[in-house]
């Protein structure tokens, strides 16, 4: 599985290159036509924002192997029981909302094997809308730990974020804290945990991908 360690996520390079090219062209034109200079400044600022958005910082993952860590930076907007249709079980669901200002690289929540993946083509409702769980475009991983515990992590597309990137595939061995994908321009990650998991976060808590402990498996 691909796992980029570069300071900027590889998916951001085309956007950065495009913005820089436009800024340079406008700067050259701006030497003769002042109006183009101001446009060059705008695209220069846009380049900095894109670099900020696609930043890919290192994270220190907790040592406890039973700890399920946050797959995304953001805020917990849902915490409670939920029946997960792919496993057909009552599980504990934790939803993390990512704004455009959060790091958007997603990380593996627990070490294990990808039993299966799924992709659902759907709408692009605001991810804070309850309907987004069932109607929005989404991609998920069903992961099984060495102890046989199963959990699911789902990338949910949103109103602005319409591009889900997932590097993991069925059969992959995932390592907790490693990068496995991203969602462009803000969205949501849903984590479905075994119901007996000891949850360690609350509604409204801020999470840091790869570091914040969501819960402890039995």
UniProtKB/Swiss-Prot annotation:
TM region positions: none
Topology with respect to the bilayer: Peripheral membrane protein
Principal EC category: lyase
Note describing how the cofactor binds: Binds 1 pyruvoyl group covalently per subunit.
Entry comment on modification after translation: Is synthesized initially as an inactive proenzyme. Formation of the active enzyme involves a self-maturation process in which the active site pyruvoyl group is generated from an internal serine residue via an autocatalytic post-translational modification. Two non-identical subunits are generated from the proenzyme in this reaction, and the pyruvate is formed at the N-terminus of the alpha chain, which is derived from the carboxyl end of the proenzyme.
Residues at the catalytic site: 187 (schiff-base intermediate with substrate)
Pyruvic acid (Ser) carried by residues: 187
Keyword Lipid metabolism belongs to the record: yes
HAMAP family in the cross-refs: PS_decarb_PSD_A
Name under which the protein is recorded: Phosphatidylserine decarboxylase proenzyme
Organism phylogeny: Bacteria, Pseudomonadati, Thermodesulfobacteriota, Desulfuromonadia, Geobacterales
